[in-house]
């Protein structure tokens, strides 16, 4: 693991955007793995600035998002489809048919999981995967559990994750209880992984990921088995190292 610590979240975002831009410049048809949540927003805004400056071009690239809530249609304002359009895709030139996000409203979520894994394989795999990390150490929606799940799967969200996502919804009752998520095997198949963490509320998870044992109770700890992982942290998230 490479570990880089920055003064604040905006610098983390700029550093991640610089690495993603370098990937796109070296391989214009790169397959990017993208994440949602508040942590990668500065990264996406920095990428938009690089695109507007003519530094980076998305026209040949494609993307696969990590996850989507079960039961939310793509047009729902709290769906990850909506999030990605607002934070990135509406502002750059990635073709719509190159953008892939799980269908959380699919009639059969299990079939959707198999389809999504097959689509990633058909695209040649993910070149650079962006990850955030949950307070409980989850990556994607791979929650602490008694085992690691390899492929795309349906996840029952933990109470801590439901509470963390409560702020995005009108009420706690409206927060989805399940999600479709890439599994750790799908994530580890990426050729390069960028793990972003900002804020002191992520410090314990980062400590456990880096300093603790590899365990499914801290899902991000499995990243220590990958040969090309770059951690981009602000000082608050690195505070327990």
Language-model-detected regions and their locations in the chain:
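Ligand-binding beta-strand-loop-alpha-helix segment within the catalytic cores
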Residues: 56-128
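Glycine-rich phosphate-binding loop
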Residues: 124-149
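Glycine-rich beta-strand-to-loop/alpha-helix junction loops that act as flexible
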Residues: 34-39, 131-135, 198
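Glycine-rich N-terminal segment of FAD-binding domains in flavoprotein oxidoreductases
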Residues: 26-52
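Class I SAM-dependent methyltransferase SAM-binding "motif I" and its flanking Rossmann-like core
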Residues: 140-184
């Amino acid at each position: 693991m490479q570990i880089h610590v920055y003064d604040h979240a905006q610098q983390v975002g700029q550093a991640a955007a610089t690495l993603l831009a370098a990937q796109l410049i070296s391989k214009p048809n790169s397959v990017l793995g993208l994440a949602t949540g508040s942590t990668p927003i500065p990264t996406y805004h920095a990428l938009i600035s690089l695109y507007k400056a003519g530094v980076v071009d998305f026209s040949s690239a494609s993307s696969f998002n990590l996850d989507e809530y079960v039961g939310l249609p793509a047009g729902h304002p709290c769906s990850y489809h909506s999030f990605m359009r607002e934070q990135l895709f509406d502002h750059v030139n990635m073709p719509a048919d190159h953008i892939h996000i799980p269908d959380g409203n699919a009639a059969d979520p299990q079939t959707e999981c198999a389809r999504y894994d097959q689509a990633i394989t058909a695209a040649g795999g993910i070149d650079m995967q962006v990850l955030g990390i949950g307070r409980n150490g989850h990556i994607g929606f791979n929650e602490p559990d008694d085992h690691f799940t390899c492929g795309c799967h349906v996840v029952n969200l933990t109470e801590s994750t439901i509470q963390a996502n409560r702020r995005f919804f009108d009420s706690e009752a409206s927060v989805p209880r399940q999600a479709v998520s890439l599994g750790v095997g799908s994530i580890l198949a990426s050729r390069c992984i960028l793990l972003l963490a900002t804020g002191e509320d992520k410090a314990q998870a980062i400590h456990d990921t880096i300093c603790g044992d590899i365990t499914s109770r801290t899902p991000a700890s499995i990243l220590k088995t990958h040969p090309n992982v770059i951690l981009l942290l602000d000082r608050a998230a690195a505070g327990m190292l």
